[in-house]
């Protein structure tokens, strides 16, 4: 898995550093934070407008983040991540949407060992933003 996000624009680097700090402040037993999707691949869209069937629509990529915990109820972690969202958007210059997925490390490693495509693609294309060093991915 990659660890560098030097290909990202400065605003994204700053946003991600802020988001990681907020997650670590609020989510106990956070073991890993992984950026995946278009920002990890470098195919993100900052803003695009299209006319679809006569309706003007806009689109922008979001930050897709997998938050990996140990010994935590994933529903409770989901609620804690909602507070990260709230805090992040209180700053008016933070405009890129965040999409969180959270999983327990045991479930994630089980999914990886079973070859589940979604998780293996994250492992191949993702960027490790934070790693506690307590666990390894299968």
PLM features: residue spans?
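Metal-dependent nucleotidyltransferase catalytic core
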Residues: 2-27, 53-113
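Short gly/ser-rich loop at a beta-strand->alpha-helix junction or flexible surface loop bordering the NTP-binding
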Residues: 31-45, 49-52
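Catalytic cores of NTP-dependent nucleotidyl/adenyl transfer enzymes across multiple folds
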Residues: 123-138
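A conserved SF2-helicase RecA2
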Residues: 117-123
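Conserved beta-strand termini and adjacent loop/short-helix elements that scaffold enzyme active sites
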Residues: 36, 101-105, 132
């Amino acid at each position: 898995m990659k660890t560098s996000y030097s290909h990202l624009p400065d605003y994204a680097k700053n946003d991600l550093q802020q988001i990681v700090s907020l997650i670590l402040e609020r989510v106990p037993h956070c073991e890993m934070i992984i950026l995946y999707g278009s920002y990890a691949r470098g195919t993100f869209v900052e803003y695009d407008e299209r006319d679809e069937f006569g309706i003007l629509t806009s689109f922008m990529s979001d930050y897709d983040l997998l938050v990996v915990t140990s010994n935590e109820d994933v529903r409770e972690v989901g609620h804690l991540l909602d507070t990260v969202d709230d805090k992040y958007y209180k700053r008016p210059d933070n405009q890129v949407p965040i999409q969180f997925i959270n999983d327990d490390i045991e479930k994630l490693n089980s999914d990886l060992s079973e070859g589940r495509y979604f998780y293996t693609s994250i492992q191949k294309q993702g960027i490790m933003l934070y790693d506690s060093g307590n666990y390894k991915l299968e």
